[in-house]
Structures are given as C-alpha cells and as structure tokens.
C-alpha cells in the first residue's frame, strides 16, 4: 500500500479532482467529530479518477490498487447501492 505524499490535510487546498477532494473532505470531517476512520471505499469510477490523478502527479510507482492518506486506507470495491464513497470505521473498544 502506497502513502500519497505531499497532501497536508491541515491546510488542504482543492486539487481539482473530485476523487481526492472527496477523500480529503471525508477524512477532515471525521477528524472534526473525533471519529476513527479506518478506510475509504471508492466505487470503480471514482477510484479510476484517483488512480489517474496519482499517476499524473506522482508517476508510475503510484499506479497501484490501494493507497493510504493520513493513515486512512483508500481502496476500490464494487458498490451496488449507487453511492460513490463508503466509510469504514475502527470498532470501539470497551473499557472495563
């Protein structure tokens, strides 16, 4: 899994790419509310947009099937519900 470099989510500037902007907005939103995001799952169409963006900006070494952004895994799956993005969270651990 490759880590996408040079993306500072504390001072995020839009990249003019809907896929990476959606992923960044999702991570920023979850951090704002203190939610522990494990993974972002993109539909095939949006993952292909992200893959093209990574290839154009970072070269062939980033033309992979999975990435991470700020510790959040980004991957492609078939989504049958018509949504473009799904979120997967870490399970809460009970304190005894």
Predicted segments, located by residue:
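Extended oligomerization regions of viral-like shell subunits
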Residues: 32-96
């Amino acid at each position: 899994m490759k880590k996408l470099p040079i993306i500072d989510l504390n001072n995020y500037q839009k990249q003019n790419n809907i896929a990476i902007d959606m992923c960044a907005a999702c991570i920023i939103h979850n951090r704002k509310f203190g939610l522990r995001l494990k993974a972002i799952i993109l539909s095939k169409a949006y993952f292909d947009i992200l893959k093209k963006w990574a290839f154009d900006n970072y070269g062939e070494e980033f033309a992979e099937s999975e990435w991470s952004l700020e510790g959040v895994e980004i991957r492609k799956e078939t989504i049958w519900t018509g949504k473009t993005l799904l979120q997967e969270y870490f399970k809460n651990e009970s304190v005894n």
